[in-house]
Amino acid sequence: MKKLTISLCLALTAASVLLGPVSAMPVGASTVSTTQDNSHFSHKEAGVEFELPKGWKAKPDGEVITVSTADDGLQMVFWVPAENTFDAAVKDLDKELEQTIKNIKTTDKGTSDTHNAMAHFSTGGTGEVNGVTIEWSVDVLAAKKVVIILTFAAPGIAEKHADEAVQFISSIKKIG
């Protein structure tokens, strides 16, 4: 179910990159909580929280959270993979990505470090979702559980949101 939800989120986002903003209502039970101002979110299952930059949106859909910029040009999908360990999730990352992104070309071979006291691995590249060319990056964090954050946008769009993205990424912290 998570893979179907992620695929649908990516398909809707790929369409929005070409056609403009898309709105979807959350479906299913959520492991997400928000504050009254809707800018602070937590993914309880993963054990992470984050603060949205002004104008950004978060759409919980069951165990998946899709975060997007105000113009929907950049999207980030958070989910807990089936793998129970950080190392297993990193090892199986290609298989996970290939279920949604086609013609994957990795342009960043990957780096390992820590992010806000969590083990962190990141990589990136290009590919296609439903025939639409995208640039993608993926981050794996070891929080309460392993969480994968897939970020994607049309080529050249990510740079437009670089400052906001840095602010957002620095706000991702472990809870619980």
Question: What residue ranges belong to the model's regions?
Answer:
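Conserved polar/disulfide-associated segments of primarily extracytoplasmic proteins
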Residues: 59-149, 155-157
